[in-house]
């Protein structure tokens, strides 16, 4: 609770004094100041939420620091750090992203090895329940519903879980996406790049050799991570995707969709659907490859099955546009002709 003197007595007779409250504990500010039910109620003049850097802003920062990274390497750093300026400030000049990963996560010095626990401890007075939620969500790429989380965490107090989820969402660690139509329910998904990178490669890893990322970790494992992380990168830059599609001025709703596998049907998942007011739906497939991405016959058949499964939900009257988001574009072949829109990494760097 805010101190009584601040709420009712401090500077009450001074019209030229402003109180500026700032901090990284977004949920605390929302609960105690913006939604204050006491003396601060309805007294907030201006709200200014500071968002993480976008790829465009990270590129400007990299250029300012003379790090000499191309866009693919900037994107790889973003997939590990997100847009948190502090993490970017730790990148050593004259070192590649791979060398920086070695030093910050796997070197003999602590670097960012202790950051995970310190991060949540700095934001939340009692970090344990928040970390439990993060760890649980980290095991499910598509996310979990509130009821699923409650069952897995064996939490009896549903109201408290709701508050924890709201706090994590306010702080940008998780997102809640609604089912197609956006009526009821919702799924919580971990989207914090640093937490996901830490949980996949650093947590429980005793390596202090300083070359784990470049020498000991297989390229296949890294590419698997890049594929998943690139999808999150796209989810964090939907306005840029809309701009590249030429629909910045069109009202849209953004969804994800999944269908669990049963004995009768295959499981299916689409991470990004852009539902447009003009009646079209961009079904986005996000594919990471260091060169041009080639749509193979088997890959195209998988995409077709996803489209047909999704069409069963929305009905035949809606128009679905297959949209491919890749790093360097699509390799020309017969299957490329069935793609209605192409987005490349450069498009995600738009302001």
Predicted feature locations:
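Phosphate-binding site recognition
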Residues: 1-215, 220, 322
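A cross-kingdom feature that marks ATP-driven nucleic-acid transaction machinery
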Residues: 180, 186-351
